[in-house]
Regions:
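A contiguous loop/helix-start segment that scaffolds small-molecule binding in enzyme catalytic cores
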Residues: 140-163
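Generic beta-sheet signal
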Residues: 71-75, 101, 145-150
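Flexible, charged surface loops at secondary-structure boundaries
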Residues: 2-6, 68-69, 124, 140-144
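Short, surface-exposed amphipathic charged segments that create phosphate/polyanion-binding patches used
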Residues: 51-60, 116-119, 142-146
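Class I SAM-dependent methyltransferase SAM-binding "motif I" and its flanking Rossmann-like core
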Residues: 79-143
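Class I S-adenosyl-L-methionine
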Residues: 3-97
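Short beta->alpha connector loops
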Residues: 16-17, 134-136, 151-155
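Structural signal for conserved beta-strand scaffold positions within catalytic alpha/beta enzyme cores
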Residues: 12, 37-42, 103, 123, ...
Length: 164
């Protein structure tokens, strides 16, 4: 929370603060965020690499304008920024352009769910697979261990079977 409070600008990967889940979560523990300058910028969830690259470049250039003015910029994201996160696209560009950038870890949703349920995702030699479900996933149904399907809103119902 100290880092959020130290920012001159908070980037929200959404059309509006009302639609930003990360903003709503942070607002519960840091109500002063509602008085901070915000930049709402939706990140497209598309597979067309050229369009995605153009969108990320446009978003980064907007953020870099603030950095050039000497502002401290933070970006909210849900889960952990290192796991299929929109933040990493900006982080890489900032580092490539000589800016100081820091990744502040969070709690991935699948870890939070396992903790809430009181279960382990993997023990001893059990494998844990994290799979981007927005792509082809059929081959992964035979993986041993625990499979975590991220970004799964578009895969519909998957066949589940209990392993013995």
């Amino acid at each position: 929370l100290e880092i959020i409070r130290s920012c001159d600008l908070i980037v929200l990967p959404a059309v509006s603060k009302e639609e930003c889940y990360a903003y709503r979560i942070v607002g519960q523990v840091c109500p002063e965020i509602s008085d901070m300058p915000l930049l709402c910028t939706p990140f497209p969830m598309i597979k067309d690499e050229k369009k995605l690259e153009l969108a990320h470049t446009r978003i980064y250039e907007t953020i870099e304008d603030y950095l050039r003015r000497g502002q401290i910029v933070g970006m909210l994201t849900i889960g952990d920024p290192g796991i299929y996160s929109t933040y990493l696209y900006m982080h890489k560009r900032a580092k490539e352009n000589g800016w100081q950038a820091e990744i502040i870890n969070g709690v991935p949703s699948f870890c939070a769910v396992a903790a809430k349920l009181g279960i382990s995702l993997g023990e001893k030699k059990e494998e844990i697979h994290i799979i981007p479900a927005a792509y082809e996933v059929e081959d992964t149904f035979s993986y041993s261990g625990t499979c975590v399907y991220m970004k799964s809103g578009k895969i519909g119902r998957a066949s589940c079977r209990e392993r013995v």
